[in-house]
Amino acid sequence: MPYLITDDVSSKPDHRSLDVPWQSVGAKCVVTLAAKLMLAVLPPQTSFFKLQVRDDKLGEQFSPEIRSELDLSFSKMERMIMDYIAASNDRVAIHQALKHLIVGGNALIHMSKDGLKTFPLNRFVVNRDGNGNVLEIVTKELISRKVLDVELPEPQPNRVVDETGSEKDDVEIYTCIKLDKSTGRWIWYQEAFDKVIPNTRSTAPKNASPWLVLRFNTCDGEDYGRGRVEEFLGDLKSLDGLSQSLIEGAAAASKVVFLVSPSSTT
């Protein structure tokens, strides 16, 4: 699926282009598996969670009528949350993250006030400790200068510009997320041209971070995970090689050569 990890237009001109597969069997398998996982994570017309109060917190002083009223209120809240998810683009972001987890094994989801946003593997880096806990995250985004309300330096005349001309209109924004061990809170801010952008610093509790770094398969001692596709990499490479040979052989066999007839007058 070439659209999952695309070529970085802001990289160097000598950047090696990513390979395009010769078959789509792997893509069909990824789409099918992502759809099944999507039904398990966010089933349609069904709540995937339940709100309730623990019995040890309620005590025995509450009557059954009060308990039933609490259950009814919680059911209304569940429906409100499900309606909000259905009206937002959260399903699209989660479905995209599932594809990245299946193929690359890694995905980053940011839960903001505007909804969920998925970062592919070529748009973020992560650092973990020996136990797999996230210590630091850095993301990269291309944002138009018109959207930013801060003054930024103009691009240099001798700077490499891509064919689309996005180097003049877009700015590379880096978001740094760190865990402050002294306060036990997550701190993040944004930078552009090696300078911190004003009014971009935010914090969150350690157990309520809006940045979710997901891994499909966990490998001990590694910062990144491994995808489901890696388990079948040998079969996919063999299929891709055979498909390439079949396509190139068919193209060579279908070559048409026009010759002049000896009996013709021309």
Report residues per predicted region:
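Generic detector of intrinsically disordered, low-complexity, polar/charged segments
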Residues: 23, 56, 101-102, 129, ...
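Active-site and NAD+-binding cores of ADP-ribose-processing enzymes
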Residues: 108-220
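Compositionally biased, low-structure terminal segments
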Residues: 4, 49-50, 63, 175, ...
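Structural beta-strand/beta-sheet cores of well-ordered domains, especially the beta-sheet scaffolds
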Residues: 105-107, 122, 172-175, 235-237, ...
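Extended, helix-rich architectural segments
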Residues: 1-159
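Short, well-ordered loop/turn elements at secondary-structure boundaries
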Residues: 102-105, 168-171, 182-183, 233, ...
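Extended, charged amphipathic alpha-helical segments
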Residues: 187-266
